[in-house]
């Protein structure tokens, strides 16, 4: 069965060093912007090949619109988070996915934190949202995209709150960065540097466009295969 997926990509620059961001990441809950995060537990952690592999289990809750109440009764949802910290390349990659309600809405998210030339830290978030609810898939995916963007803003605000408290005198890059870049695609992420494919109501408009989109998706996942393989290699 082919399941349609919507994607969203956001970029956030934190005016703190990569090391400070990584340290704060493990201490970012609780904060005033994360009341929807109920629990977090580290269930596995190990060092392999000089990299830190971690697996955490979180529970979160979010209110849904009235039309969504028929599918989701607002019970907490378990989230598993795998991460890889590479101190040599100064990258920190997280991969999260929900364990419950996956037929209603499945959200796979990859975030890469990397050091910038001016000493700040760039976080690139990519989410892939799918739904198997017949007749409501498009509406649920659209809701998921908007919720992802809203939660991303909350996460950035909460993260900055923790960074300010932990490292009050450690701003880098002049403290002038803005959180501004967001791109979405109902049919798949289409990097502007590769191919542009026009879409209509979330569907690719012709067979040639479909082939182009498939090529884009293949190239993207091929380029990230090693990271995804590393994340999944954390043993259960």
Curated annotation (Swiss-Prot):
GO biological process, alphabetically ordered: dendrite morphogenesis; mitochondrion organization; phospholipid transport
Database matches in InterPro entries: PRELI/MSF1_dom, Slowmo/Ups
MF (Gene Ontology): phosphatidic acid transfer activity
Lineage: Eukaryota, Metazoa, Ecdysozoa, Arthropoda, Hexapoda
Tissue specificity comment: Widely expressed.
Main location: mitochondrion
Compartment(s) of residence: Mitochondrion
One GO cellular component, as annotated: mitochondrial crista
The PRELI/MSF1 domain, residue ranges: 5-171
Keyword Mitochondrion: yes
Function per UniProt: Involved in maintaining the structural and functional integrity of mitochondria. Activity is required for maintaining the subcellular distribution, shape and activity of mitochondria in neurons and as a consequence has an important role in the development and maintenance of dendritic arbors. Function may be particularly important in class IV dendritic arborization (da) neurons.
Knockout mutant characteristics: Lethal at early larval stages.
Key words of the record: Mitochondrion
Protein name, as recorded: Protein preli-like
Domain of life per record: Eukaryota
Keyword Mitochondrion part of the UniProt annotation: yes
């Amino acid at each position: 069965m082919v399941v349609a997926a919507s994607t969203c990509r956001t970029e956030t620059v934190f005016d703190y060093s990569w090391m400070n961001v990584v340290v704060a990441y493990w201490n970012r809950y609780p904060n005033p912007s994360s009341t929807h995060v109920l629990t977090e537990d580290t269930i596995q952690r190990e060092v392999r090949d000089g990299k830190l592999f971690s697996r955490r289990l979180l529970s979160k809750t979010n209110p849904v619109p009235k039309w969504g109440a028929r599918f989701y009764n607002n019970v907490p949802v378990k989230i598993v988070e795998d991460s890889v910290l590479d101190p040599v390349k100064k990258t920190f990659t997280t991969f999260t996915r929900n364990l419950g309600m996956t037929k209603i809405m499945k959200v796979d998210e990859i975030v890469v934190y990397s050091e910038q030339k001016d000493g700040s830290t760039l976080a690139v978030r990519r989410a892939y949202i799918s739904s198997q609810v017949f007749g409501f898939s498009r509406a649920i995916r659209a809701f998921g995209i908007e919720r992802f963007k809203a939660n991303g803003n909350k996460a950035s605000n909460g993260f900055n709150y923790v960074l300010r408290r932990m490292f009050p005198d450690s701003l880098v890059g002049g403290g002038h960065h803005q959180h501004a870049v967001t791109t979405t695609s109902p049919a798949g992420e289409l990097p502007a540097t590769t191919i542009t494919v026009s879409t209509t109501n979330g569907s690719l408009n012709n067979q040639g466009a479909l082939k182009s989109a498939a090529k884009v998706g293949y190239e993207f996942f091929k380029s990230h295969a090693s990271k995804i393989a590393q994340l999944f290699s954390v043993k259960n």
